């Protein structure tokens, strides 16, 4: 009755039961979630442990790889240092050998000096002995002279002193002559050693220049376009460049002929651009030639700057640099003048280092020694004098200016630097293969050399050898004496200098031989 009369009781019971059921369900859900969370946490921890192990392995591998790379790098550095040490060891050994050789030479010279000193001492002792003998002789002759000729003691002493002084002066003159000859031989040997060292240490590249250039054509039809209507195009090219265009049967090629390398290069580059562009007519030709000329001026300026950089010559006037660049397209007996100037600069530097003088100054003088050849066709005078004036005009030191003017004996050399430039110039120009001549002119020059020698009286035969750098003359011993042979060689050399033009120098050797033949019967 109570429950019926109070329906809220059922509702409360239902709520209590529902709450209990919800509580238990919630509790189970929470427990299940906790289990899931614990399982996930465990899984995360396990995954983290696995990832950590993997990272540890990767880090270990990476560290091993880095250690290996560092080890390889260190081994390479150690090997490089070991090689450097070996090179230094070889250099030191070479220096020790050089020092040892110099010591041996010094000891030999010292021994020669010791021998000479001993000989001098022996000679002095002999002189002392002679003095004593002379004194004794004076004492003996004093009374005899006074008795026979009435000569006083002072007069006798004067006669004897004059005799002894004359003998001593003769001995001293002989000794001085011997020492002078020994010093000349030693100086000659040292000079030859320095020149040989310079030649051995410098090995420059050399490419012979030609007087013709060939321009390839895409087809033979292009020859007609280059010639143009009634030849107006080819005439325009020749007029603008000053180069002869030769179009012959040579397939797909045009030949450019000219002795001015700058103009020939302008013509070659201009023709290549015209062929590539396809527009070939007089107006376009003049435009392209002018453009190429400006570009070539920039190229020559860059060549001059590169030359000064290679030599280490700083502060050279910009006009001199431009003139140096022009030497790139200037040749002398087939030898490129810029390459020759660089070669002379390096040879001067090597020899200057051996002699203990300023290497940079020597290189600078060698580089600029032929600067006059860049404008010798525009200015009157020899290229040495022109170069001297240009160097003075653009602020080069007085030593450089004088060395340039003296390298071809236009003015007498007065310093070691002047002689170095002359020697390096001769080495660069006279070495085999440096300069070339056409076969006809080469043979003609040899014939002219022999003809000049054969014109002199007393010359039996003459032979031009060593590519015309040495003239051997066989003199008639019945007509030429030994003294006249020396005079003959000088006269022939003077005649060659007056009548011929040639690179380098020519040695004239007169050989006089006397033969006596008899038969035993």
Curated annotation (Swiss-Prot):
Annotated ranges, domain HD: 337-430
An example Gene Ontology CC term for this record: plasma membrane
This protein's UniProt keywords: Cell membrane, Endonuclease, Hydrolase, Membrane, Nuclease, RNA-binding, Transmembrane, Transmembrane helix
Top EC category: hydrolase
The keyword Disulfide bond is annotated on this UniProt entry: no
Primary site of residence: membrane
Gene Ontology molecular-function annotations: RNA binding; RNA endonuclease activity
Subcellular location(s) per record: Cell membrane
PANTHER family given in the database record: RIBONUCLEASE Y
Name by which UniProt lists this protein: Ribonuclease Y
Species of origin: Desulfotalea psychrophila (strain LSv54 / DSM 12343)
């Amino acid at each position: 009755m109570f429950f019926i009369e109070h329906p809220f009781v059922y509702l409360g019971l239902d709520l209590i039961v529902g709450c209990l059921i919800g509580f238990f369900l919630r509790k189970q859900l929470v427990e299940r979630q906790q289990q899931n969370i614990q399982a996930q946490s465990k899984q995360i921890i396990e995954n983290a442990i696995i990832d950590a192990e993997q990272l540890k392995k990767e880090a270990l591998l990476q560290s091993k790889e880095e250690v290996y790379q560092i080890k390889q790098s260190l081994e390479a550095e150690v090997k490089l240092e070991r090689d450097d040490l070996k090179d230094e060891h070889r250099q030191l050994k070479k220096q020790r050998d050089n020092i040892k050789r110099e010591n041996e030479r010094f000891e030999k010279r010292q021994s020669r000096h010791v021998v000479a000193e001993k000989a001098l001492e022996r000679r002095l002792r002999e002189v002392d002995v002679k003095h004593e003998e002379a004194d004794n002789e004076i004492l003996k002759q004093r009374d005899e002279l006074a008795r026979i000729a009435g000569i006083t003691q002072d007069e006798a002493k004067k006669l004897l002193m004059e005799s002894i002084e004359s003998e001593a002066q003769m001995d001293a003159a002989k000794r001085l002559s011997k020492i002078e000859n020994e010093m000349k031989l030693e100086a000659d040997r040292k000079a030859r050693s320095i020149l040989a060292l310079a030649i051995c240490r410098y090995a420059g590249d050399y490419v012979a220049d030609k007087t013709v250039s060939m321009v390839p054509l895409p087809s033979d039809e292009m020859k007609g376009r280059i010639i143009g209507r009634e030849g107006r195009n080819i005439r325009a090219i020749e007029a603008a460049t000053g180069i002869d265009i030769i179009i012959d049967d040579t397939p797909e090629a045009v030949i450019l002929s000219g002795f001015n390398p700058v103009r020939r290069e302008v013509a070659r580059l201009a023709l290549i651009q015209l062929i590539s562009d396809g527009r070939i007519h007089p107006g376009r030709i003049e435009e392209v030639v002018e453009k190429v000329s400006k570009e070539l001026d920039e190229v020559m300026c860059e060549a001059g700057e590169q030359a000064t950089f290679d030599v280490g010559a700083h502060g050279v006037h910009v006009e001199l640099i431009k003139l140096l660049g022009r030497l790139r397209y200037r040749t002398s007996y087939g030898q490129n003048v810029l390459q020759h100037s660089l070669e002379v600069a390096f040879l001067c530097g090597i020899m200057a280092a051996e002699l203990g003088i300023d290497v940079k100054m020597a290189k600078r003088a060698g580089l600029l020694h032929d600067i006059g050849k860049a404008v010798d066709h525009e200015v009157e005078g020899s290229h040495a004098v022109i170069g001297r004036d240009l160097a003075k005009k653009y602020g080069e030191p007085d030593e450089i200016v004088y060395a340039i003017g003296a390298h071809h004996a236009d003015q007498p050399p007065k310093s070691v630097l002047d002689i170095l430039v002359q020697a390096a110039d001769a080495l660069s120009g006279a070495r085999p293969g440096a300069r070339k001549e056409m076969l006809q002119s080469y043979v003609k020059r040899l014939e002219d050399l022999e003809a000049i020698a054969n014109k002199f009286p007393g010359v039996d035969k003459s032979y031009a050898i060593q590519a015309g750098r040495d003239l051997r003359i066989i003199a008639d011993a019945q007509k030429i004496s030994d003294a006249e042979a020396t005079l003959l060689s000088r006269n022939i050399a003077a005649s060659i200098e007056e009548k011929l033009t040639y690179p380098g120098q020519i040695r004239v050797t007169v050989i006089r031989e006397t033969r006596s033949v008899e038969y035993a019967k």
